[in-house]
């Protein structure tokens, strides 16, 4: 039978807790026997507790627990491990970045004309942030939101990657001619009178 007891000199990165401390954490068993049972089932590392007469008291290494239990006990103890400290820093960096993005977007939205704001809202509601900020997200996903099939998107990407002359040659075979500049009507549209 495998023993979970370890030597004292291997405990540098360990956090040792009594079963009573462990059972006080959220989501942990409500009795000492329950803590011992879970520790045996999950294979937590244990050691004899120092200074206890009779030598039957044990304490468990929190770092040997599965992630869920470990996080619950560490939170209960109010401790921070190197892992949780790094995660906290990463969350803080992410939170600061999101706050900065939010502020920037709000400032930009405040500068929009009412018509531009309506268009942006329509794009946002139809395609999400991807439609509003296509350069941030995958270009192929943007085209699929607009309604292009995957095959059309791939064809478009392939044609776009070709040299201009080759692209014109291929498109001309299908009667499609690229326009060099903006097309402007040669005359103003005539008003149409409705027949009564």
Swiss-Prot record:
MF (Gene Ontology): DNA binding
Domain HTH Mu-type: start-end pairs: 13-81
UniProt keyword terms in alphabetical order: DNA-binding, Early protein, Host cytoplasm, Host-virus interaction, Latency-replication decision, Repressor, Transcription, Transcription regulation, Viral latency, Viral latency initiation and maintenance
Induction profile: Expressed in the early phase of the viral replicative cycle. When present at high concentration, negatively regulates its own expression by binding to O3 (PcM promoter). PcM promoter, and thus Repc expression, is blocked by Ner. The host SsrA, the ClpXP host protease that degrades Repressor c protein, the Lon protease, and the stationary phase-specific sigma factor RpoS are all influencing Mu repression in response to either temperature or stationary growth phase.
GO cellular component: host cell cytoplasm; transcription repressor complex
UniProt feature coiled coil, ranges: none
Protein name: Repressor protein c
């Amino acid at each position: 039978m495998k023993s979970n007891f370890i030597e004292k000199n291997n405990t540098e990165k360990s956090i040792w807790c009594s079963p009573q401390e462990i059972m006080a954490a959220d989501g942990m068993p409500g009795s000492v026997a329950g803590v011992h049972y879970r520790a045996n089932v999950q294979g937590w590392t244990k050691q004899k507790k120092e200074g206890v007469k009779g030598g039957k008291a044990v304490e468990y290494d929190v770092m040997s627990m599965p992630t869920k239990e470990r996080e619950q006990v560490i939170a209960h103890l109010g401790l921070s491990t190197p892992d949780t400290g790094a995660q906290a820093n990463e969350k803080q960096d992410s939170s600061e970045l999101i706050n900065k993005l939010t502020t920037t977007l709000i400032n930009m939205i405040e500068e929009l004309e009412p018509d531009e704001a309506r268009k942006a809202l329509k794009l946002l509601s139809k395609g999400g942030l991807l439609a509003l900020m296509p350069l941030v997200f995958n270009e192929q996903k943007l085209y699929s939101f607009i309604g292009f099939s995957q095959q059309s998107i791939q064809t478009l990407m392939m044609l776009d990657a070709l040299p201009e002359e080759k692209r014109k040659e291929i498109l001309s075979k299908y009667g499609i001619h690229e326009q060099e500049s903006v097309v402007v009507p040669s005359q103003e549209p005539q008003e149409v009178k409705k027949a009564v």
